Design a protein with these regions (language model features):
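A short acidic, Gly/Pro-enriched loop at the edge of an enzyme's catalytic core
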Residues: 93-100
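Class I SAM-dependent methyltransferase SAM/SAH-binding core
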Residues: 46-90
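C-terminal lobe and adjacent flexible extensions of AdoMet/dcAdoMet transferase-like proteins
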Residues: 201-244
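Class I SAM-dependent methyltransferase "Motif I" SAM/SAH-binding loop
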Residues: 41-45
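Conserved class I S-adenosyl-L-methionine
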Residues: 1-35, 46
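SAM-dependent methyltransferase
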Residues: 135-205
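Residues lining the SAM
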Residues: 104-106
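A short glycine-rich, Lys/Arg-flanked "PGG" loop and its adjoining helix->strand segment in the class I
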Residues: 118-130
Length: 244
């Protein structure tokens, strides 16, 4: 499973307006602008660049070097961003004292099992200073088990075409992506499979508390409403606002 094959077209077919909603959620979650931020699984850096004007320093990392190459190429004059390659399961112990950490775009769902989830959350918590804020989102079981079941999508422009199909097994969804990239009069076909897994809410809450967070708030609609089990049965994402 890798984003390498689709790094160059990731933003082209992504809903970039969603990143503005993540930014609003982030800024509304703190009373004072954060000085030092860790952006976990930053991808092509779209959210990182949106947040940069509101903080002093952002360290942003991703597992996929191809995604980071795109991020660096779009960085421009934002000198307060530092991109680097890293695995959220093996973070450098010297990276500490962050005011805030973010992990959006359901990135935690790409971890393979509960043990990896627990390890990643513990590493993130250890990077934060006491009272530091962690913001993230994950797919809900409804989204994975129902909304993604039989999902298919097609989009195209002058240079690329995207075919996207999803298969579901339990709370695991496999996304089969095919990109056709125009090369002169021909098209190059690029195939990749991305697998995501989610869990019942209790698993996430328990893992966050065990990782070292003292407060865990669960929200929906990009932080617009506190999650209520009966009222939000068809919510697509859970948003977590956590304090160390």
């Amino acid at each position: 499973m890798s984003f390498t094959a689709i790094a160059k077209v990731y933003d082209r077919f992504n809903d970039l307006e969603t990143y503005e909603k993540w930014l609003d959620f982030t800024l509304s979650s703190t009373n004072t602008p954060p000085q030092k931020v860790l952006d976990v699984a930053c991808g092509t850096g779209w959210f990182t660049q949106l947040l940069a004007p509101f903080c002093e320093q952002i360290d942003a990392f991703d597992l996929d070097e191809a995604m980071l190459e795109v991020a660096r190429s779009e960085q421009g004059e934002q000198a307060n961003i530092r991109y680097f390659q890293a695995d959220m399961l093996e973070l450098d112990a010297l990276m500490t004292d962050y005011d805030m950490a973010t992990c959006y775009a359901d990135s935690l769902c790409f971890l393979q099992n509960e043990q990896q989830l627990q390890t990643a959350l513990a590493h993130i918590a250890q990077r934060l200073k006491k009272g530091g804020l962690f913001l993230c989102d994950v797919w809900t079981p409804y989204q994975v088990g129902t909304a993604f079941d039989g999902f298919n999508y097609f989009d195209s422009d002058d240079e690329y075409a995207l075919l996207w199909d999803s298969d579901v097994e339990g709370l695991t969804v496999s996304h089969y992506l095919t990109v056709f990239a125009k090369k002169g009069d021909l098209y190059e076909r690029i195939d990749t499979t991305l697998t995501e897994k989610t869990y019942p809410l209790k698993v996430y809450r328990d893992a966050l508390f065990q990782a070292g967070f003292s407060q865990v708030e669960v929200l929906v609609d990009y932080g617009q409403d506190v999650y209520h089990e009966r009222r939000h049965k068809t919510a697509d994402r859970w948003f977590f606002r956590c304090v160390k």
